[in-house]
């Protein structure tokens, strides 16, 4: 129990340090050409057990798309979007990941986000989840801004879609 608490505190400290570096623009991006679909498939594989536990399916749409970015940082963005989609998805639903020429999106069927909170979810320490730190989307925002990518979220009829876009 104590080891788990120490691990949680350690993760929180590391996230806060990472966020402060990102906000100060004290991060050098290691930009290289990456295959976004391949990266996405690798990330989805890591979530296989969690997906089975929640009886969720993943559908990846789109072809191989190459972008120039920092692989580690874009991986963090996709992991955050996917973990949030899983956390808030209805059991027995499908999460759709769409990879287009200049857009990546993840949509789930689940609880919508209050329209009044759409802008604030990107700020530090804002979370719907008592277990969450509220740092994930703030880190995502800073990573995407460093990459000069746009990003956003909107409610769907029966869920939520998060996306990011880049210039082609």
Which residues does each PLM region occupy?
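Short conserved segment of the HATPase_c
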Residues: 113-125
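Glycine-rich ATP-binding loops of the HATPase_c
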Residues: 148-156
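Short alpha-helical segment of the dimerization/phosphotransfer core of two-component systems
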Residues: 4-9
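A conserved beta-strand-to-alpha-helix junction within the catalytic ATP-binding
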Residues: 30-48
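Short helix-loop "hinge" at the ATP-lid/N-box region of the Bergerat-fold HATPase_c
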Residues: 85-86
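Short conserved segments within the C-terminal catalytic ATPase subdomain
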Residues: 50-59
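Conserved micro-motifs of the catalytic ATP-binding
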Residues: 24-29, 62, 66-72
């Amino acid at each position: 129990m104590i080891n788990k608490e120490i691990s949680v505190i350690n993760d929180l400290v590391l996230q806060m340090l990472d966020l402060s570096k990102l906000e100060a623009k004290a991060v050098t991006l290691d930009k290289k050409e990456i295959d976004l679909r391949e990266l996405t498939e690798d990330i989805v594989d890591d979530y296989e057990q969690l997906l089975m536990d929640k009886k969720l399916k993943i559908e990846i749409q789109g072809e191989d798309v190459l972008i120039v970015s920092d692989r580690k940082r874009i991986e963090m963005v996709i992991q955050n979007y996917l973990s949030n989609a899983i956390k808030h998805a209805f059991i027995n639903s499908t999460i759709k990941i769409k990879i287009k020429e200049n857009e990546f999106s993840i949509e789930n069927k689940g609880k919508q986000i209050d329209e009044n909170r759409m802008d604030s979810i990107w700020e530090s320490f804002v979370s719907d989840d008592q277990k969450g730190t509220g740092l994930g989307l703030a880190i995502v925002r800073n990573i995407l801004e460093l990459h000069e990518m746009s990003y956003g979220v909107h409610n769907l009829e029966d869920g939520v879609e998060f996306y990011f876009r880049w210039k082609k």
